[in-house]
Amino acid sequence: MIELKNLTIGYQQKNNEKVVASDINATLHSGRLTCLIGANGIGKSTLLRTLSAFQSPLAGEITIQNPSHAPILISARPMTRSQEKVLSRLIGVVLTEKPDVQNMTVFELVGLGRSPYTGFWGRLNNDDKQIVAESLQLVGIESLKDRLIQTLSDGERQKTMIAKALAQQTPVIYLDEPTAFLDYPSKVEMLTLLRRLARETEKTIFLSTHDMELALQIADELWLMTKDTSDATDLIIGTPIELATNGSLSHFIDRPGIHLDPKTLTIKVTNCQ
């Protein structure tokens, strides 16, 4: 479980702070697929980077429950090396960028997920290799294990990066736009896979996406970043049905000619002639 308490996210700009969103209080639960949605530029990437400890919060804190040790706290205070090492065994991150690797096989790249345990240049023992093989199997790409990364399709490459995160054996996986650049069937397959992994492995899986209708159909929970009446960024949390019923999704989605059907959770386009 991950708890956000009075969290303020943003950037340090010379002598002042650029606040993106403040007073965020929320909880991410294990065994669920949670999708972060919202307009371009509203701060989804900033929130994801803060959760991943790639940048520090401006205020507040993030508490990550640790099955093996004491909880890890992410705050404005810099983390120690020992805390960073523990964090690498708690959080796996899958980014949108293509991996900058050449002449590396799928098995070798997924094997890098074991580096928190072996060191970056560490050799994989038999247990590590078994974990890599199981990760490939969970994602359904065991037949690709000997393929070079540069020969993969976008969908195959994305599955490889997810397998790498699984091989890291973290209880938490964050993904930034995992369905970007995929065709529609591959988008459905990817989100369905992530939901299945969350449920089967009891992991906390949290991702940002612009694939609104798929998120409505597949996510267990939605985090909707939106602007309130005072133009401050607000975070609305609930199941797709809950956010459809209370009008939050319609307020975000509906435009002239674009309408959310709250009963079917589908987006309808009219007057497109």
Regions found by a protein language model. Give the residues of each.
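H-loop/switch region of ABC-family ATPase nucleotide-binding domains
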Residues: 209-210
